[in-house]
Amino acid sequence: MATFAELVLSTSRCTCPCRSFTRKPLIRPPLSGLRLPGDTKPLFRSGLGRISVSRRFLTAVARAESDQLGDDDHSKGIDRIHNLQNVEDKQKKASQLKKRVIFGIGIGLPVGCVVLAGGWVFTVALASSVFIGSREYFELVRSRGIAKGMTPPPRYVSRVCSVICALMPILTLYFGNIDILVTSAAFVVAIALLVQRGSPRFAQLSSTMFGLFYCGYLPSFWVKLRCGLAAPALNTGIGRTWPILLGGQAHWTVGLVATLISFSGVIATDTFAFLGGKTFGRTPLTSISPKKTWEGTIVGLVGCIAITILLSKYLSWPQSLFSSVAFGFLNFFGSVFGDLTESMIKRDAGVKDSGSLIPGHGGILDRVDSYIFTGALAYSFIKTSLKLYGV
């Protein structure tokens, strides 16, 4: 296709046979600017001005066309780069999702076996997770994002608190009630912070006390729930066919059934909230976690209650439908509140994950944050609101 400059050049020439085309020189004659005394006009007129204007016009048009072609090529190059980046991002997300699913299944199966085993197996596994999670918590407290505006507790205090947190589930299994022990431990840690060298800070005390409560005391309620509620779930059908070598029907207690339903409710909340947010997510839930949406949260609530009702019908616990709905709502609330709490800590710390222990998932806290408050809510609900523990 001819360019605009070529069209202008072709139309500027006369092809009529009545006269021949004569090319005028582009160099101005020497006499073209000669003037007589008193005259304001030159003796000879030339078409140089008209020709110069035409040349400038054609040059500008040609340059504009070349620039336009260059811009088009540049835009195509940018689009090509963006397309490659989008493909790489999709492949990366698909790889991360695949890794999360593989490690999620690899972790979920052993955890299910640990919950079924109960007793010391469950308690020791929980204590190990608590120890690692508490170490991650105190590392978050010492990170640049949080430590920038406060003075973190000394490292020896953080290590002592991690050990105390790990001992809480074990002491709960042995003594049942550890309120006095936890209070005594918190008092000793507070004294150690107050008599340290230098200038003690309130931020050190508050972050340490919260660490003991968040990483140690709250997870201990899972031991109370799984091992403390030893009343048999008499109406559970699966208990009748359970092998005698594994405990028989007596193995299926209220604590075991409630723990399985709570774990399943937390998993359902995370799964349905993720799928609902991807499909319907429009309205942000909170600035703490920008990726969470109200639509995904509502879908997570519906999914959690639905799974709780289905499992309660299958396991015949609790007997009341209203109790099943209330239990599902508490599991949902504990899951969301625990997730947002850890998101707030990580946001202040300026990190994406609490650690890198689990590929594709982050640290221990990133996986158990939804369970931290749920155990306490589930245990309190069964102890205070269900007659005969819902049997």
Swiss-Prot record:
Q: What does the record list as coiled-coil region(s)?
A: none
| UniProt catalytic activity | a 1,2-diacyl-sn-glycero-3-phosphate + CTP + H(+) = a CDP-1,2-diacyl-sn-glycerol + diphosphate
Q: What class of enzyme is it?
A: transferase
Q: How is its activity regulated?
A: Highest activities is obtained at about 30 mM CTP and 2 mM phosphatidic acid (PA).
- pH profile of the protein: Optimum pH is 7.5.
| Keyword Magnesium among UniProt keywords | yes
Q: Where in the cell is it found?
A: Plastid, Chloroplast membrane
This protein's source sits in the domain of life called Eukaryota
Protein function: May be involved in the synthesis of minor phospholipids and in modulation of IP3-mediated signal transduction. Promotes the biosynthesis of plastidial phosphatidylglycerol (PG) which is required for structure and function of thylakoid membranes and, hence, for photoautotrophic growth.
Q: What is this protein called?
A: Phosphatidate cytidylyltransferase 4, chloroplastic
Gene name in the database record: CDS4
